[in-house]
């Protein structure tokens, strides 16, 4: 419940630009968000494994 309220609050335009911060578009997680994709590292990993992010491959060396 609290996370839903925070996501609703986050979706509004802040009074000052410095108050804005990145959140995951899927789960609302505030940490480890990849700006290019707009999702957190956990959701990014899941989407990459499903093949939903074009051009993304698992690295192995």
From Swiss-Prot:
InterPro entries: Ribosomal_uS14, Ribosomal_uS14_bact, Ribosomal_uS14_sf
Record carries keyword GTP-binding: no
Keywords annotated in UniProt: Metal-binding, Ribonucleoprotein, Ribosomal protein, RNA-binding, rRNA-binding, Zinc
GO biological process: translation
Cofactor-binding details, from the entry: Binds 1 zinc ion per subunit.
Claim: RNA-binding is one of the keywords in the record: yes
Cofactor(s) needed by this chain: Zn(2+)
One GO CC annotation: small ribosomal subunit
MF-aspect GO terms: rRNA binding; structural constituent of ribosome; zinc ion binding
Residues the record lists as binding Zn(2+): 24, 27, 40, 43
Origin superkingdom: Bacteria
Assembly information from the UniProt record: Part of the 30S ribosomal subunit. Contacts proteins S3 and S10.
Role according to the record: Binds 16S rRNA, required for the assembly of 30S particles and may also be responsible for determining the conformation of the 16S rRNA at the A site.
Family: Belongs to the universal ribosomal protein uS14 family. Zinc-binding uS14 subfamily.
Annotated HAMAP family: Ribosomal_uS14_2_B (MF_01364_B)
Protein name per the record: Small ribosomal subunit protein uS14
Organism (species): Clostridium beijerinckii (strain ATCC 51743 / NCIMB 8052) (Clostridium acetobutylicum)
């Amino acid at each position: 419940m609290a996370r839903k309220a925070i996501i609703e609050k986050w979706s509004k335009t802040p009074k000052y630009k410095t108050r804005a911060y990145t959140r995951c578009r899927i789960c609302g997680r505030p940490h480890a968000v990849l700006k290019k994709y707009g999702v957190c590292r956990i959701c990014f990993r899941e989407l990459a494994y499903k093949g939903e992010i074009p051009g993304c491959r698992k690295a192995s060396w």
